[in-house]
Amino acid sequence: MKEKLELWYVKICTPDFIPLDPVQFPHRYKKRQDVEIVSFLAATIAWGRRDLILRSAEKMFALTGKSPYDFVVSGEYKKLKNKNIHRTFFENDLKYFCRGFEHCYAKYGNLEKLFASSEDIWRGIALFREEMAKGNKGIYSKHISNAGEADKSGSACKRLNLALRWLVRPGPVDLGLWKSIKPSSLFIPLDVHVARTARKLKLLERKSNDKKAVIELTERLRAFCPEDPVKYDFSLFGMGVMS
């Protein structure tokens, strides 16, 4: 199984993958804060048809301009109306994220410090959700999943885990921007396609695509590569889409 996963990883994880994937958007920026913001925003709308995701992301980042970080801290986002961006994600949702980011950057300086201050990824996700709510008068967003309490069931947090994969793992596809969090601590961004492929390969037994399934699959993949289990996200994607 490891040999098969490695072969697919080498096949899929190449620079040619970048223009076909939402990861292309954070690759367009150089400033740390821009890359962080764009990673979380692009991952947040990464559901549905890939071509529509890319089109919607182009629309969203046209709104945020050359520096999404400047767009946030200048308060420029307050001029947004409430036009649709992607499926159930509207300009009001983008404003929510901008207010949350503004709070997080004022408190932590960068988002890496926010996540690195937690004991593990799940607690980091929970803290991110809490801090984003604090920037929005205590209101939670349906677009930021609830990881639940430690060791208990909760959302798979696919889109947050995807953003974290981009920011933590080294290239050529992922960004490797964050150095204080190790790839070994990441969890698989579990979508329906990856889950289906994992079950076919007997790597995942749990029927629900939730937090417990993410932990189960990541632990199975960790047996093949303890230092970087989430690399096989590319393998499972490739097997599911291309084979």
Describe the predicted segments one by one.
Residues 1-243:
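HhH-family (HhH-GPD) DNA N-glycosylase catalytic core used in base-excision repair
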